[in-house]
């Protein structure tokens, strides 16, 4: 049931988990890297098919753009929303209380719009770099897994900005056992991808530390939106590193 809960939360795949309010949602975090690998496997498969088609010759950037759209579609844009909200809240000179209010505001501000555009452009360019060689495609499987593993670490280690927010809800039941399962899963996935799989496993937690420490400094802790921003920053940083090495 925890596995189905993770699939239902992190993707738009048509699963119907049996929700049990007595089961702490944090237990599902043990499967986050596995779901990330599922997302990445779909993306790698689509990328392989695109590279074998006539699309790269007809429109070189189109396969990468379609893959980025598929990435957002599979996840339902869940983490992109958190990234945009965090850009609006974290980069304006206001009080901690005002930042938390901005996170609740459903409207997209200028910082959020620019931040979202920059993130997607960088991600698009990195995907284009990875799709230059079939040997790099396994990285697409590891990147989403490593980013969600980094999220599990952040949720376990860093404090919450609100004791009753969404982040607090999803962290309930997250313990050392879940972190250990997520870590072993992420390491195995990276190892199966070869030496290039190590790159996301190193870069994703570093990106997580940057976002988490910024959130602690300006919000007092992590929120549900920060969780999403961590995933997006970790994915993007890992993609950039993977396409440069």
Region spans (language model):
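Juxtamembrane transmembrane-helix boundary signature
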Residues: 77-82
């Amino acid at each position: 049931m925890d596995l189905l809960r993770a699939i239902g939360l992190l993707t738009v795949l048509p699963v119907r988990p049996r929700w049990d309010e007595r089961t702490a949602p944090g237990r599902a975090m043990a499967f986050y890297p596995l779901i990330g690998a599922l997302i990445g496997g779909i993306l790698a498969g689509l990328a392989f098919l695109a590279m074998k088609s006539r699309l790269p010759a007809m429109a070189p950037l189109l396969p990468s753009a379609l893959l980025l759209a598929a990435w957002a579609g599979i996840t339902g844009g869940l983490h992109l929303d958190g990234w945009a909200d965090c850009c609006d809240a974290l980069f304006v000179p206001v009080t901690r209380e005002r930042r938390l209010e901005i996170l609740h505001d459903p409207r997209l501000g200028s910082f959020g719009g620019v931040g979202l555009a920059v993130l997607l452009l960088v991600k698009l360019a990195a995907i284009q770099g990875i799709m230059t060689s079939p040997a790099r495609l396994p990285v697409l499987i590891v990147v989403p897994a490593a980013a969600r593993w980094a999220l599990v670490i952040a949720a376990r280690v860093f404090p919450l900005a609100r004791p009753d927010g969404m982040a607090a809800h999803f962290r309930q039941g997250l313990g050392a056992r879940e972190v250990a399962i997520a870590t072993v899963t992420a390491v195995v996935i990276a190892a199966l991808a070869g030496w290039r799989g190590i790159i996301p496993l190193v870069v994703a937690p570093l990106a997580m530390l940057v976002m988490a420490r910024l959130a602690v400094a300006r919000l007092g802790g992590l929120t549900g939106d920060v969780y999403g921003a961590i995933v997006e920053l970790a994915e993007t940083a890992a993609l950039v590193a993977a396409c440069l090495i």
